Amino acid sequence: KLTSIQSITDFMNCAGRTLPDNISLWARRNLAVARSHEVSPEERRHAQRALSMMMNIQWKSNYFEAIDPVEARRILDEELYGMERVKQRIIETIIQINRTHTLPAYGLLLIGPAGTGKSQIAYAVARILKLPWTTLDMSSINDPEQLTGSSRIYANAKPGIIMDAFSMAGESNLVFIINELDKAASGKGNGNPADVLLTLLDNLGFTDNYIECMIPTVGVYPIATANDKDQISAPLMSRFAVIEIPDYTPEEKKIIFSRYALPKVLKRIGMKEKECILTPEGLDAVISCHENTSGIRDLEQAAEHIAANALYQIEVNHVSSVTFDAEMVR
C-alpha cells in the first residue's frame, strides 16, 4: 500500500501513461503540495492522504472480456432457487456485455419484500462479472456530504463514502450495491442524497469534494435494492432496469429450506445431513410457523435453531442422529 511520499513518487514515475491523463495531472499537482514547505502542515497531510487513496486504486479500462453464459447460469442456479425471470434478465445483460465489451447503460433495480434474496442476487452478479463489490446503505445516509466528502479547507475534512468504496475495492471497475434505494430521498441534512446518486449513475464521472478530481465511472455497475418502488423518484428510477421480485410460495419455501437453508447450516457447523433429519411433517410445520412472514430470512434462522438443537443433543446426549417431526419443530 502506497502511503509515503517516496513510495507514491516512485509509483508515479513507473506508472507513466497507465494513469488516466486527468488523474496523472491531478497527482503531480498534489504531489507538489505534499512536498511543499510553503503550505500548512494540514494541507500537506490532506494532499498526501488524497494521493495515497488515488494511487492505490487500479484505474482500469472499460473494456470487459467475454463472459461464459453457461458458467453465469451455473452460478445463478447455485446461488438462487427459482427466480427464472431474474436469471433470464441477468443472462441477457451478460450477452449484451459480450457483444459490446462494455457495461450496460443501466444498472439493475431489484424491488421486492424483505428477505427475498435481493442482496444475494447482487453478490451473484458481482461473482459472474469477476468484479469486487461494495455496498452503500442509503438508510444510514442523512446528508449528501456523507457521500461526496468534505472540502480540504476544514481541519477534519475526509473523503466521502463513495470514494471510500473505490479505495476499499482497489480498482475503478466494481459492482456498486445500493441497499434501500427507496430511503435515498429521506435525507435530514442539507440537500438530498438522491441527487448525489444521480451523478454516480450517469456514468459521466464522479468528483469527491475532498479528492477534487473527476474519477471515471464507466466501469461501475450499480445494483440497487428496494422494498417500495413508490418511494423512489422518477429520475432515479429511470437510471435502472427494474426487476420486481415476488415473495416465495409455500412450496418454494419448502424446497429452499430442505435443499438450501438447512444443508448450508449443517455444512457450516460441521454436521452431516444424516445427523439432522427433518420429516415431511416437520418440514410442513416449519413452513406453517413462518407462513405470515415474507422472504426466507426467518426460515434461515429456523434452520440455525434446528441444526444447533441437533448438535446439542448429539454432543450432550450422545445420540447418533436427531429426527425432527412436527411436534419437535413446534
Where are these regions (language model features)?
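Charged, amphipathic alpha-helical segments characteristic of ABC-type P-loop ATPases involved
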Residues: 1-34, 41-42
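AAA+/P-loop NTPase substrate/partner-engagement loops
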Residues: 128-158, 165, 252
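Short loop/turn elements that form and flank the Walker-type P-loop nucleotide-binding site
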Residues: 103-106, 129, 148, 169-174, ...
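Conserved catalytic/switch belt of AAA+ P-loop NTPases
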Residues: 178-216
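Pre-Walker A (pre-P-loop) alpha-helix and adjacent loop at the N terminus of AAA/AAA+ ATPase modules
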Residues: 25-63, 67-111, 162
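AAA+/SF3 P-loop NTPase mechanochemical coupling elements
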Residues: 169-177, 208-226, 274-278, 323-327
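Conserved C-terminal "switch" segment of AAA+ ATPases
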Residues: 16-25, 61-62, 170, 228-238, ...
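Walker A/P-loop
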Residues: 104-138, 167, 234
